Amino acid sequence: MGNVYNREFQEMLIDHADKSADRIIPFVYDLFTPNSVVDFGCGTGNFLATVKKYSNNKCEVLGLDGNYIEKDLLQINFEKEFMSVDLTATIALEHKYEMAFSLEVGEHLDEKYADIFVDSITRASDIVLFSAALPGQYGVHHVNERYISYWIEKFSDRQYQCFDIMRPHFWWDHDIDLDYRQNMMIFVKQNADGVNEALVGKLRSLETHIYDIAH
């Protein structure tokens, strides 16, 4: 699997993610103001690097991905902020994070690992920014393209509520890569510590309920 995600692929990630992260992170950070973020399948770490920049380095970050990530392309500190992992295996971190990201990663893992992957994410945080490729989106090693309702059901089984607030806000923002703006969702664990009713009410006021749509 590492050979699939070669240097050329990782350079492409930088091109796709940088501009998108600059648009997405301010919205997400201002809404949740997390003090710590973990990214499952961080790639070259662009989203976490933008979190650090936007928070003036006040937010702790950890990027998780395979051992094929090129050290010189990584946008976060390789020694302190990156951990090489197998995303198809159970991942247990030293502590919970205030927010977890997983952006355009789930489609790269065989369907038999989907529940393990979601378990790892939900074990790590009560608030999740998630996106995964839709059927027909295609890409390098896309082996489990699914409509968003598939992932909503998996998070719901773990008592996470879906808030469709990202797509209405960014749907027509052409500074953001299409994959992100048509697939991003927020998931919040029900009755979680630190998730107050005011926040839930705000999320509900921003969301839609039309899940399985695409550009």
How would you describe each model-predicted region?
Residues H108-L109:
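A short His-aromatic
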Residues M1-F101, K112-A124, Y138, H142-Y150, ...:
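Conserved N-terminal segment of class I S-adenosyl-L-methionine
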Residues S125-P135:
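Conserved beta-strand signature within the Rossmann-like core of class I S-adenosyl-L-methionine
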Residues V105:
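Hydrophobic adenine-recognition pocket in adenosine-nucleotide-binding enzymes
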